[in-house]
C-alpha cells in the first residue's frame, strides 16, 4: 500500500491505537513511555494538512509535491489538537467519576485515575477523525449502537484481562457501560468533527 493512499493513514491510525491499547491494558504504567511516543505519532497523523502533504510528497507528481511542501510550512493545526484533546478530557473526566463512584477499581490505592488510562483516552480520541471518521456519516442511533457494542466491549475486555476491577459486579457494570457508551460515542464523534472542521466539515471520509 502506497504512502500516497488515504487507506495507509487509516490503517496506520487503527494499528497504532491497537498497539497502544494492548500495551497499556497488559502493562499499565510500565508501558506509559512507549504509549506516549505512539501518541505523539498519532497527534501528527491526525492533522489533515500533514496527511495531505505526505500523500502529495509520495504521489510522484511535481505539482503535488510542491503543494505538499506548502502545506508543511503552514504548521500544525491547533484545531486538530483540540479535536483530540477535548474528547479525551471528556472521557477522562467520565472515567474519573466512575472510579470515584466505586464503579471501577485499579491496582493503585490512589483515587486518581491511573496515568495509563488517561493516555489510552488520548489514543482513542486520536481515532475519531481518522479510522473512526466513518461514524460521522451514520445516523445517531447507529453511532449509539456501535458505542454500546464497541465501547462497552472494550471495557469488558479490559476487565477480563484484569486491568480493572468492577466492584458492583459484571452484569451491573456492563449494563451501565452499555448505556453510557450509547450516549458517549455520538457525543465524542460530534465534538471531534465540530472542533476540527467547524461548519466546513468534509462531505465524507477523513481527509
Language-model-detected regions and their locations in the chain:
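Aromatic-rich, lipid-facing transmembrane alpha helices and their immediate juxtamembrane interface loops
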Residues: 1-61, 65, 72-207
Amino acid at each position: 500500500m502506497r504512502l500516497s493512499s488515504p487507506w495507509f493513514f487509516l490503517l496506520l491510525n487503527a494499528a497504532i491505537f491497537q498497539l497502544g491499547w494492548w500495551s497499556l491494558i497488559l502493562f499499565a504504567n510500565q508501558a506509559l513511555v512507549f504509549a506516549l511516543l505512539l501518541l505523539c505519532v498519532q497527534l501528527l497523523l491526525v492533522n489533515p494538512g500533514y496527511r495531505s502533504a505526505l500523500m502529495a510528497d509520495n504521489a510522484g507528481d511535481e505539482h503535488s509535491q510542491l503543494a505538499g511542501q506548502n502545506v508543511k510550512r503552514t504548521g500544525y493545526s491547533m484545531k486538530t489538537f483540540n479535536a483530540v484533546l477535548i474528547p479525551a478530557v471528556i472521557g477522562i473526566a467520565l472515567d474519573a467519576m466512575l472510579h470515584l463512584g466505586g464503579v471501577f477499581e485499579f491496582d493503585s490505592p490512589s483515587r486518581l485515575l491511573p496515568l495509563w488510562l488517561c493516555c489510552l483516552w488520548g489514543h482513542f480520541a486520536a481515532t475519531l477523525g481518522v479510522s473512526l471518521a466513518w461514524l460521522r456519516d451514520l445516523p445517531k442511533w447507529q453511532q449509539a449502537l456501535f458505542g454500546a457494542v464497541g465501547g462497552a466491549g472494550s471495557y469488558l475486555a479490559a476487565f477480563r484481562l484484569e486491568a480493572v476491577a468492577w466492584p458492583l459486579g459484571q452484569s451491573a457494570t456492563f449494563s451501565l457501560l452499555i448505556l453510557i457508551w450509547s450516549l458517549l460515542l455520538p457525543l465524542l464523534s460530534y465534538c471531534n468533527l465540530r472542533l476540527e472542521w467547524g461548519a466546513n466539515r468534509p462531505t465524507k471520509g477523513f481527509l
